[in-house]
């Protein structure tokens, strides 16, 4: 799958580091971007999953937009 085409990378400079090979018995660990930088716990996706896991939370938060709209309509000055 990983075939190197020299024609595709004509501008790429090949240095000694590109031909690096591990020493016998040396351990190589390739970490993905997510493993190196885990998502913060305050991200919207993680809080959304917590709400979906708890039935009471999902029910109460579903009513919040309607409640907020009702309060806004009460406190808005009419012109």
UniProtKB/Swiss-Prot annotation:
Pfam families on file: Gemini_C4 (PF01492)
Polar residues bias spans: 48-61
Biased composition range(s): Low complexity: 38-47
InterPro entries linked to this entry: Gemini_C4
Keywords tagged on the record: Host-virus interaction, Inhibition of host innate immune response by virus, Suppressor of RNA silencing, Viral immunoevasion
Region feature Disordered, mapped onto this chain: 1-24, 36-79
GO biological process terms held by the UniProt record: symbiont-mediated suppression of host innate immune response
Purpose: Pathogenicity determinant. May act as a suppressor of RNA-mediated gene silencing, also known as post-transcriptional gene silencing (PTGS), a mechanism of plant viral defense that limits the accumulation of viral RNAs.
UniProt family annotation: Belongs to the geminiviridae protein AC4/C4 family.
Name this protein carries in UniProt: Protein AC4
Organism: Abutilon mosaic virus (isolate West India)
């Amino acid at each position: 799958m990983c075939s190197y085409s020299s024609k595709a990378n004509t501008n790429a400079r090949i240095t000694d580091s590109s031909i690096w090979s591990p020493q016998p018995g040396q351990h190589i660990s390739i970490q993905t971007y997510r493993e190196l930088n885990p998502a913060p716990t305050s991200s919207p996706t993680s809080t959304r999953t917590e709400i979906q896991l708890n039935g009471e939370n999902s029910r109460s938060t579903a009513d919040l937009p309607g409640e907020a709209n009702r309060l806004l309509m009460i406190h808005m000055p009419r012109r």
